[in-house]
Amino acid sequence: VTGPVVGVVGAGAVGQTLAAGLVSVALSARLVVVSRRTEQVRGLVADLQDMALSVRSRTHVEAGEVADLRGCDAVVVALRTDFRNDAVQDIRRGGATANAPALGALARELRGYEGSVLVVTNPVDLMARRFAEVSGCARVYGIGSNLDSARYRLLLARYARVAPDRVSGHVIGEHGDQAVPCLSSTTVDGLPVEGRARAVVEGLQERPALIRAGIGRTRCGPAGAVLSTLRKTLGLVDGVEELSVPYGDVWLGIPIAFTGGVPAPCCPPLTRYERLALDSAASSLRDAYTQLPEPTERIPA
């Protein structure tokens, strides 16, 4: 069977859900699952193989090591270290200190990797930057703002009582408390709807807490955001994803247009208020990055 090869690092809630999604839609010819929890990854692979047969998926699923990821066209990093998150604000940043060393260690092992790396591990804007700086990989994207944008469009579609595909709009900045909805450029059927868009912002901010209260951790939404991004980074379809990428001296979410797998920023015009909000998010992320544990080794300049 020919087709792309995708690696998934992490067999927790998001890794499991993503892997099941990859198998069900048969996006890749091979799926390589890597985790430090050997027994867990063996069980997950067996479960996915059963699923693949049941749904007649062409995807071959196997357990692997980090070295096997070099043979993948794309790698999704969904690892999460063991820690207790007691944060009541900036919840996604709660794992920064715990997750940064693990991201750095993986990045060192993947130095020179030439495929696309999609980072899901939170706080994603900080972790994507850490992975890119330590590994030197050129195609690193953080997953988060595209999930925020999907939620935004869904809530606005419900509010306006239209199908979601009639809504156009972006959420940029931090995947977290300082996300910036681009109200001024949001449209329904091509017409501006800034007033109605403003009405759903509170619901957008509350949605992650609603999910956590019900199932403990978001998993399906992030997995869907990864699947959508993989299709574009692998050049299977063209389109736009809001992804965390370099923005000045920080990383944060902006719209990226993919054509044949080639990315190009396509941020909409911003009002003065939206620009100030984006600058505030950048400043906060800049400060937060300085608080991360220093990587033990960086890639040579």
Region annotations inferred by a language model:
Residues R58-G94:
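NAD(P)H-binding glycine-rich loop region in Rossmannoid oxidoreductase-like domains
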Residues R161-A301:
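Long, compositionally biased stretches enriched for glycine and/or charged residues
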Residues A13, R36-E39, T97-P101, L126, ...:
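Conserved active-site and cofactor/substrate-binding residues in soluble primary-metabolism enzymes
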Residues V1-L44:
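NAD(P)+-binding Rossmann beta1-loop-alpha1 motif at the extreme N-terminus of oxidoreductases
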Residues V5, D73-A74, S116:
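Structural motif
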Residues V32-C72:
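Conserved N-terminal Rossmann-fold NAD(P) cofactor-binding segment
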Residues V23-V25, Q49-L53, R129-R139, A157-V162:
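Short, surface-exposed basic-aromatic patches at helix termini and helix-loop junctions that form
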Residues D90-R153:
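Rossmann-like NAD(P)(H) cofactor-binding subdomain of soluble oxidoreductases
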